[in-house]
């Protein structure tokens, strides 16, 4: 909800003409996402691509830029809406950042206090997120960090490593 209010205030798509396309997101990530979407919908090799630059090792590109499970939703995305997909994905990931931090705080502090939601929001809308949210592939790490810490705490305290291994 907070992100939607910011979108309205700043005129960011779908409430205006502005987008998250900045620096590398415009020059690199959007073409990578478009190529990945094309490969998913038209069946192409995920090993190599002649359509990016002068040809690239697509498996290496996938490993660094596209390996997020969220990116497989591109198979449902029409070709002309890849940039919009990326914008919605950023909003989704920022929301999941707040949710994972709130979950961590709830389990770590053993409370259901309403204030935990605020700290989840603070985490999701931190300065780092404001400055680097266009680095879409790194947002998964910000989502997983509280879960990794919680998993590590459970591993050390209780000898249970399932969450740590999954995160």
For each predicted feature, which ranges?
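Membrane-interface coil-to-helix junctions
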Residues: 2-101, 121-143
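Membrane-water interface at transmembrane helix exits
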Residues: 74, 102-106, 153, 157
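Hydrophobic alpha-helical transmembrane segments
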Residues: 88, 117-121, 162-166
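Transmembrane-helix signature of polytopic, membrane-embedded enzymes
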Residues: 102-124
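Transmembrane helices and adjacent periplasmic/lumenal helix-loop junctions
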Residues: 128, 135-136, 159-167
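Membrane-interface transmembrane helices that cradle and orient dolichyl/undecaprenyl
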Residues: 148-163
């Amino acid at each position: 909800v907070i992100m939607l209010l910011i979108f309205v205030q700043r005129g960011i798509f779908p409430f205006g003409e502005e987008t998250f396309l900045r620096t590398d997101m415009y020059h690199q990530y959007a073409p990578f996402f478009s190529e990945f979407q094309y490969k998913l919908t038209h069946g192409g090799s995920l090993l190599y691509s002649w359509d990016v630059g002068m040809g690239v090792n697509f498996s290496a590109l996938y490993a660094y830029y596209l390996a997020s499970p969220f990116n497989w939703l591109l198979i449902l995305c029409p070709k002309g809406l890849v940039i919009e997909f990326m914008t919605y994905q950023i909003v989704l990931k920022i929301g999941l950042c707040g949710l994972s931090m709130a979950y961590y705080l709830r389990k770590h502090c053993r409370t259901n206090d309403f204030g935990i939601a605020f700290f989840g929001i603070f985490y999701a809308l931190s300065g780092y997120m404001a400055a680097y949210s266009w680095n879409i592939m790194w947002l998964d790490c910000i989502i997983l960090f509280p879960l990794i810490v919680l998993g590590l705490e459970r591993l050390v305290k209780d000898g249970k490593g399932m969450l740590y291994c999954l995160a």
